[in-house]
């Protein structure tokens, strides 16, 4: 009797500031899309991963959403005890079909933020002419607000819709293996996955490079039979940009006894700030207001570890909720520019979390992926790779391209705005209020 050939499935995740790539799988069970239940599970899994990452040195950035989506695509191909074990390790309470439906809804929402293809609008009576709006004055010689007179014409700046380039892309790549037709169809339908039937290493890395706008050059060093990839790419202007002329070197305390000078941005405007046990948090919105970066700043210079342990899924959810409800107030914010790259092999991390069957071809059940009984098509995950890049500057957070309208800032500031000086190691979260997803998160211990 011929020996069944073992199939290897790698899971790939990459994030470029946000770009993230990860494999995903899911099956259909039915039920209403519950996006928030889905992202709660992703966020809970993300906090568990962050605790593991935090044992190492240096800055960190990763995408809980990307990793969660990748693992969901894998989960879609599992059955029986393998499915139950994966769902438990991933904090999932939804059934396979519910996970698939919720992912379809989340992807549609997140991919809908890019309005760069939507034409700008002009004030009434004016039309777009090149890079500005132009039209004739009224009979009385006036111009419609906010246009102004320029010679014989009225001119105004076009209004662009709030926009963020947030791309969620998935792929199923076959490099020597095969999958069931209904599994490939599921990924196409619910995850908008591209399917490549003859993939090479160049195909995989080239796809990742393209989907992350070159932020992630390479994700895999070796091929497996079946490759599942998720990529998340983000770039957006701040709702209120920082003035580059105000950026200057400021002290950043690496420890109580060591300080370094780092380029630090300054902004005086209104933000939501909350005080929590051991730390303060501030919400910095992007041009699309449902997207924001949240900074969690420990009260103590060396308090990052305690705050990170305290910020589990429940505390994170409560803190984000408190920020959304908090009225904005005048704030003098100092925030260092920073750029972080990070990569992680997640196989051992998930095994530590109790996920063992998906990595054991003798005992795993991937019959949903293969379309064959487990005994005739032994299959196992052999790679879970995640890479992420983030860059924060005066204009934007980097990892994608985006256009956004400027937001008018109130010029009159009280004499004593709240001081929020990010001059010590801190945590950050890039969140989407519409779905509840933590798209990226990390820590900065040294912004240089």
Model region roles, listed by residue range:
Residues 119-123, 139-144:
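Disulfide-braced loops of extracellular cysteine-rich modules
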Residues 57, 95-123, 152-307, 317, ...:
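Non-catalytic, conformational "gating/processing" segments within enzyme and secreted inhibitor domains
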Residues 58-60, 425-428:
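Short loop/turn microsegments at loop-to-beta-strand junctions
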Residues 126-129, 144-150:
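Extracellular, cysteine-rich, disulfide-stabilized repeat modules with beta-strand cores
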Residues 2-5, 13, 20-120, 157-196, ...:
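Detector for small/aliphatic-rich hydrophobic stretches
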Residues 133-135, 143, 154-156:
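Short linear proline/tyrosine/threonine-rich motifs used for host-factor recruitment
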Residues 426-448:
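C-terminal or internal capping secondary-structure element at the end of a domain, subdomain, or sheet
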Residues 419-424:
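Short loop/turn motifs at secondary-structure junctions and domain boundaries
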